[in-house]
Amino acid sequence: MSKTIHYQKTHFITSAPDIRHLPEDEGIEVAFAGRSNAGKSSALNRLTNQKSLAKTSKTPGRTQLINLFKVEENCHIVDLPGYGFAQVPLEMKKKWQKSLGEYLQKRQCLQGLVVLMDIRHPLKDIDQQLVFWAVDQNIPVQILLTKADKLKSGARKAQVLKVREAAVDFGGEVEVDAFSSLKGIGVDKLRAKLDEWFAPAFELDDEFIEDLDAE
């Protein structure tokens, strides 16, 4: 029996400059990553039906920390630093890139990665690097083509198909869908994907209860 996850109860736990400052590497984490202007904060707020869970900034590139949110017991969402914004100093870009790579390659409890890309400008070099990193670690990836409301229905579908075809080159488990925080496009599909990734946490709970009942 699948558990209903109440994403609206998601709340902030802590911020960390790198994985060494995160809580214990246990439970299940789903990470969100994307270019600084891809609409990551808006997507997290829409997912959880909260207006300011993830703070949106008028200056892209401000999110320099790894932000951790608790969804349920043993289930967390990780908001990774935005990347690729032109006005950020090169040294800071390198630091963020190292932090992202380190998290994807070393965090054992990472169950899935959501990569957000503006539907009008998808698959930039650093976006692709991020997906390849995840695939190399056998981490499933959900690509969200954000700001889908900016395109008419036909153009939106064509762009999704184009990116799906390109995503075949990544290998691994990579899915592509349109998303709009403003219009709610793709929100239910995103919740369903997160439900799937978080499910093992509740299976462990059920096994624990069964063991207690058997004693």
Swiss-Prot record:
Keyword Cell cycle: yes or no?
yes
PROSITE patterns registered for this protein in UniProt: G_ENGB (PS51706)
Concerning its family, UniProt says: Belongs to the TRAFAC class TrmE-Era-EngA-EngB-Septin-like GTPase superfamily. EngB GTPase family.
Could you tell me which CDD domains the record lists for this protein?
YihA_EngB
Is Cell division one of the keywords?
A: yes
Q: What's in the keyword line of the UniProt record? A: Cell cycle, Cell division, GTP-binding, Magnesium, Metal-binding, Nucleotide-binding, Septation
Query: One cellular component GO annotation, for this chain's record?
Result: cytosol
Biological process (GO) annotations held by this record are: division septum assembly
Residues binding GTP, per UniProt: 34-41, 61-65, 79-82, 146-149, 179-181
Q: Where is each EngB-type G domain found?
A: 26-200
* PANTHER family, sorted: ENGB-TYPE G DOMAIN-CONTAINING PROTEIN, MSS1/TRME-RELATED GTP-BINDING PROTEIN
* UniProt xrefs under InterPro entries: G_ENGB_dom (IPR030393), GTP-bd (IPR006073), GTP-bd_ribosome_bio_YsxC (IPR019987), P-loop_NTPase (IPR027417)
Query: SUPFAM superfamilies attached here?
Result: P-loop containing nucleoside triphosphate hydrolases
Q: Where does Mg(2+) bind?
A: S41, T63
Q: What is the lineage of its organism?
A: Bacteria, Pseudomonadati, Pseudomonadota, Gammaproteobacteria, Vibrionales
Report the protein's function.
Necessary for normal cell division and for the maintenance of normal septation.
Report a single Gene Ontology molecular function: metal ion binding
The coenzyme or cofactor needed here is:
Mg(2+)
Q: What is this protein called?
A: Probable GTP-binding protein EngB
